[in-house]
Amino acid sequence: MIIRGLFEEVVDRMIEKGGAIHPSEVRKKTAYTSWIEKGHDHVTPFKTETLKLVLDEMLEEARVKVLYHTTFVQPVLHGCNIKGAIVFSKAGFEKINAKVVIDATGDADVAYRAGAACEYGNNQLGIVQPATMFFHISNVDSAKLEADIEANKDNFYRKDGVNYRSFHWWVEKARENGDWDFERTSLGLFKGVDDDEWFVNTSRINGVDATNNESLTYAEREGRKQADMIFRMIKKYVPGCENAKLTETASTIGIRESRHVEGDYRLEVDDILEGEVPEDSIMVCANSVDIHGRFGPKSNEYLTMRKGEYYGVPYGCLVPKKIENLLVAGRSISASSEAAGAIRVTPPVMAIGQAAGVAAALSIKEQ
C-alpha cells in the first residue's frame, strides 16, 4: 500500500535520517510482514523516535501551534454549528474558537459530544475489534530466526493456500509445556529497520471500550502483562531470540475500533472489495480488510479486493450529519465496522487527515 501526499513526505524524511525503509522495497511474504501472504504488502518499517522528530520538524516548519498535554472536553455549539472547543490542561480550562473543527480523536469524541449520531463498533454483533499492546524487542539473531521460518514453511497454517500466521509450531509447543496461557495461536513478528530489532503484534485484549477510562486503564495494564508473557515465550522457544531484550512496550494501548460517525456517505465493505472509486474520493487505497476477533478471540480475517487494484474513500465519509463546520478524520469516519477494518491503519488515516485539513482550509478561504 503506497499513499502519497504528507505520508510520502513523512516517509522520505524518515529515510533521510536512516529511520525507515521505503514501502516500495517491502513486499508481503517477508520478515517485514511476518511472512503473511495476503495483505500487508508494501508496509513501512520505521523507528518511532525518528517519526516523532520528523513530525515535530514538519509542524514547526508549517508554523502550526501545537498544544501537547491538552485534552478535549466539549464542543462550543451555536445550535447545530460548532464554533470551537473547550479543552483542559495543567493551566486549567480554555476555550479555543475555530471556523472549522476537525475531530481526529480516533473515537469521534467531538462529533459524539456535539450530538452527531454514531455507531459503536459492530452493532449487529455487539463487539469491537480487540486492542493490542505492541512491543519492541532487540538483540535478535535475525539470520537464525529467519532460518527457522525457512525450515518450517511446509508447516505454515494455510487457508485457501495462503499463509496467515507464523511460528504456530512454537506456540503449540509452548502451550503443551504450560508456557502459553493465551488464546492466540501464532506470533506476529515484524522485522524493524535495524537487523536485530523486531516488533511484536500478538497481544489481544477483547471487549475494550476506548471511550471509557477504566476500560482503557485495564487494557493497558493487561497489555503489558500479556507482552511480558509473550516475550518470555519468544525468548525461550523462538530460535535467534535466546538473548533478546524487551526494549519497550507501546506508550499507549493500540485501539482498532470504537465509534463510527454517521456521515453523508457510509463506506461499506463491498465498496472496497468491488474497487469502487466515487467522484468525490479524497484518496485511493489498496489495503485489505483486516478484521480481528469477529468470530471469536482466535479469529483473523483478511478480505482482498474482488475487482480492480484500489478503492476510493468519498469525502462524504468525513462529513457528519446534522453538525455544521465539523469534519471527522481517522478510524472513526463514516464506515461500517468491516469497512473500517481496511482504512483504520496508519497510511489511510494520514491521507484522510490531510484531506480533512485541505477541505477545512478551502472552506475558510472560499467562505
Task: For each feature predicted by the language model, list its residue ranges.
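Flavin (FAD/FMN)-binding glycine-rich loop and adjacent Rossmann-like elements that form
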Residues: 1-9, 15, 25, 46, ...
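Trp/Phe/Arg-rich N-terminal binding region typifying the photolyase-homology
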Residues: 36, 66, 75-77
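Short beta-strand to alpha-helix junction loop
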Residues: 37-54
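A conserved beta-strand/loop element that lines the FAD pocket in flavoprotein oxidoreductases
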Residues: 59-73
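A short, glycine/Asx- and small/polar-enriched loop/turn
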Residues: 77-83
